[in-house]
């Protein structure tokens, strides 16, 4: 299903897909119509979107569709698209890079660095063209956001292709550990905090049960890497630097086991049936409970020895016998996406 983003008159918002940052200036309406390893395709029906394409691999496609045309980035660069539905126009601005614009009948036109063209209708009629002379307030805001990303400390330790890496800078600190290499310590003020405790579970196809973290920095550490406890502190361990990290819905193990349905189970002190889980430690194997290729499994479990490894015994996980790391919830709260999960007493 498409992801839709609505922006009000004075609002600005930011989306990331791989190496590309999309920023909207209201009022705007944007649908993400395709997002996979090779394609980021969005549809802008009104308003303004800026696209910063940091890297473009062979076979990769970044496309912005409007009611009048389609814009495809030919190389890394900075692009801006403005749609006026009442005038039936799309303005294409290329601050750097180069883009090909396609009309309804297959017509095409190239827009190069510092060029700006206003296209009328679906046949690539040109209403106005020229060289870019100045940047407005939105362009300046985009440039400031790009500068922050350029200076990101977290980008030294994880790939920019990892969604959510930008939030790590403001909410924690990086360090080097002799056992794990680069680790990230979140700034935590909750006394009983543990990974995968403050948030909720949601059923998301095709992954199945997926962890949705409450923390603004929670996406990357919930879906990539592993967790360790170094002294009294929790540390996120991203693992070996990979150009394209592999997503997982939640890198946890459940007490009692389980699959795409909640077949795992424990008995809570109240007599209710419940679910319990804990984070995987560095080097521990995660087995997808949805269909996944051997290559996906290898890339997901790329710690140390690159050879295939069998799934470990259910009682061999490091955090399984450490109650402070285990989180529990009654089944009705788990299935209902309730945030009231807790540590066992």
Residue spans for each PLM region:
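Low-complexity, repeat-rich tail regions
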Residues: 118-345
